């Protein structure tokens, strides 16, 4: 009578065991050396890279350690942070043993699918909570701007969960837990794996993220043909820019633009100092623009 429930329960236990092994608790002394700070993270690579949140390690002055399930804490160091996406990468001490990395799922999260948050909320190590993906394409406000395309979940996320993985039913990472809405129940957020996949290699290779700028501000707007479809429209532009206010961005270097993040994703480090072909819809017609890309200064709080 209960076979299916027992099978489901056993499969969940196996899933949690797999993810728990590769999830870490991160601790360190604060800048004032008054006490410990704590957060979570997870193994990203076979070289010992650990992904977590920027706000977890920001302000950790010394004694930075990572601890795997059932193991002694080992030293780690920060090798890169990106405040704008609230991501950071640590490196385990040379020669320290660590479990296999978790696999990321780059297919988008699906509204309503089961998900699991793993980490150390409120210093309760090796905790897991279950929920569903309860919202997509959310914007998480931070001191450095909004984090685009984030995942909303009703899996319990509390202080200390930050930086830990949000995984699907196969144990693949679909997001990095980052925050909860303090004024509500069961509304938590995770940085989508799509963002993690773009930012983390930059942090590993360079220690920071360089972003390009087209000299415009953009926003989502409804199409003016009466259809129930949103487009990305130019909201503000500089006097010397080839864009005009109201231009609808159709593509960047022939890649279609459907979200604000599609434009941001195109403005990566390797295009800074070059030009991009941007196709816009202006007065009902397609116009091809050749736009110089300049380096955008990092945002500050």
Label every PLM stretch briefly.
Residues 21-26, 41, 48, 52, ...:
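Terminal peptide-recognition signature
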Residues 1-6, 114, 174-221, 279-301:
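Interdomain regulatory linker/hinge segments that flank or connect interaction modules
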Residues 2-6, 30-37, 43-126, 257-260, ...:
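Conserved active-site neighborhood of the chymotrypsin/trypsin-like protease fold
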Residues 156, 202-269, 285-292, 296-299:
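PDZ/PDZ-like groove recognition
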Residues 34, 56, 100-106, 111-146, ...:
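Flexible, gly/ser-rich surface segments that form the specificity/activation loops bordering the active-site cleft
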């Amino acid at each position: 009578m209960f076979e299916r429930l027992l099978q489901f329960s056993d499969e969940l236990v196996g899933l949690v065991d797999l993810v728990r092994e590769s999830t870490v608790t991160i601790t360190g002394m604060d800048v004032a050396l008054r006490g410990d700070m704590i957060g979570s993270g997870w193994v990203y690579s076979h070289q010992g890279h650990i992904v977590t949140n920027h706000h977890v390690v920001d302000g950790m002055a010394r004694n930075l350690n990572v601890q795997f399930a059932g193991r002694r804490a080992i030293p780690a160091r920060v090798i890169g942070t990106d405040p704008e996406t609230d991501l950071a990468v640590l490196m385990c001490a040379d020669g320290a043993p660590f479990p296999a990395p978790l696999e990321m799922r780059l297919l988008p999260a699906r509204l309503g699918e089961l998900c699991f948050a793993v980490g150390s909320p409120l210093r309760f190590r090796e905790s897991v909570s279950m929920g569903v993906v309860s919202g997509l394409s959310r914007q998480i406000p931070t001191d450095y701007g909004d984090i685009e395309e984030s995942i909303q979940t009703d899996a319990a996320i509390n202080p200390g969960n930050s930086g830990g993985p949000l995984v699907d039913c196969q144990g693949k990472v679909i997001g990095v837990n980052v925050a909860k809405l303090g004024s509500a129940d069961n509304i938590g957020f995770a940085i989508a794996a799509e963002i993690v996949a773009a930012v983390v290699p930059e942090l590993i290779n360079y220690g920071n993220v360089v972003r390009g700028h087209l000299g415009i501000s953009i926003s989502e707007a409804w199409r003016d043909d009466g259809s129930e479809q949103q487009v990305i429209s130019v909201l503000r532009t500089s006097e010397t820019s080839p864009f005009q206010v109201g231009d609808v961005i159709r593509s960047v270097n022939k890649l279609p633009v459907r979200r604000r993040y599609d434009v941001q994703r195109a403005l990566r480090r390797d295009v800074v100092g070059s030009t991009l072909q941007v196709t816009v819809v202006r007065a009902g017609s397609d116009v091809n623009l050749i736009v110089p890309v300049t380096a955008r200064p990092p945002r500050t709080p």
